[in-house]
Amino acid sequence: MQSIPIKNVGADNVSQLIDRFERQYVYLRLSVTDVCNFRCNYCLPDGYKPPSHKQQFLSVSEIQRVVRAFADLGTEKVRITGGEPTLRKDFLEIAHTVSQTNGIKKVALTTNGYRMERDIDLWQQAGITDINVSVDSLDTRQFQLITGENKLQSILKGIDRAFEIGYRKIKVNAVLMKQYTAPELDKFLVWIKDKPIQMRFIELMETGEMDSFFQAQHLSGQSVMQRLLQEGWQLQPKALSDGPAKVLSHPDYQGEIGLIMPYEKNFCASCNRLRVSALGKLHLCLFGEEGIDLRDLLSEDTQQAQLEARLKAALQGKREHHYLHIGDSGIRNNLASIGG
């Protein structure tokens, strides 16, 4: 896909999602479930606990309507997230539905990789164009310690299979932690030397349930950035639909490094994504307050104009930046409910 110049928004601005700060939103992160089967120490260390009241996640038809509205307003990329989205029995139908929406050019999946080895061929057939998979350690025992699951070797086989069936690049996520991830940096670099993997280190973010863990494990991505720059890695330009990662490449490496540093100054200046939760709420920011309900406008196709009007109106309430730097993570107790 050709990248779109960031400054040249185009003549048809009226139909686009643009906020008060001239940021254009072409990227939707769509959560389809809160449920996750991993127990990652930085997210859900005690595992997923269902709420006392029964929750009904978005149906395929509701997903179709919300994606259609976003696409009509200029969204080009949808990332399906969770929880773990592949746990839904109708996941393949969801992926196919999103991929068939007019205007959507990329359908990405964020997964813990639990079913990747088994189902990667089916994901591709359903229309998944891009995959992000979490690998917080390349050591089997350490991986199980972090995630609560002994699935590392299966996930690595799933990544290899993705390349075999034609995926040109796989993005691999690892949360940057002093005790766990940081000591394995050299091992990750060796791994991506001859593989087209974008290895993304995500700064640990402070959330309501994880304050003490954050204090013990947080490591600035800038320290990794400085080391890489000193070793000959170079920053790469970004396309409009790209995520927040600062991407570095090296002439001796087939893979890349991505650094996601939400505490960095001006992190929000290039924000290009909105979020819809599995319960049908629009979230203007990962660390914002209570979401804006869309579900009452997702039951009939005839409601699309009203839905688009609500999206555009809600966007004008988006803040210029988050307040993580002063310890305000909004109402977010963990990241599983909205897909990070």
Curated annotation (Swiss-Prot):
GTP binds at R29, R79, T110, K171, R273, L274, R275. It catalyses: GTP + AH2 + S-adenosyl-L-methionine = (8S)-3',8-cyclo-7,8-dihydroguanosine 5'-triphosphate + 5'-deoxyadenosine + L-methionine + A + H(+). It comes from the Bacteria. CDD domains: Radical_SAM (cd01335), Twitch_MoaA (cd21117). [4Fe-4S] cluster 1 binds at C36, C40, C43. [4Fe-4S] cluster 2 binds at C268, C271, C285. It holds the Pfam family Mob_synth_C. Keywords: 4Fe-4S, GTP-binding, Iron, Iron-sulfur, Lyase, Metal-binding, Molybdenum cofactor biosynthesis, Nucleotide-binding, S-adenosyl-L-methionine. Residues 20-246 form the Radical SAM core domain. Binds 2 [4Fe-4S] clusters. Binds 1 [4Fe-4S] cluster coordinated with 3 cysteines and an exchangeable S-adenosyl-L-methionine and 1 [4Fe-4S] cluster coordinated with 3 cysteines and the GTP-derived substrate. S-adenosyl-L-methionine binds at Y42, G83, S134, M205. Its cofactor is [4Fe-4S] cluster. Belongs to the radical SAM superfamily. MoaA family. NCBIfam families: moaA. Monomer and homodimer. This is GTP 3',8-cyclase. It comes from Actinobacillus pleuropneumoniae serotype 7 (strain AP76). The gene is moaA.
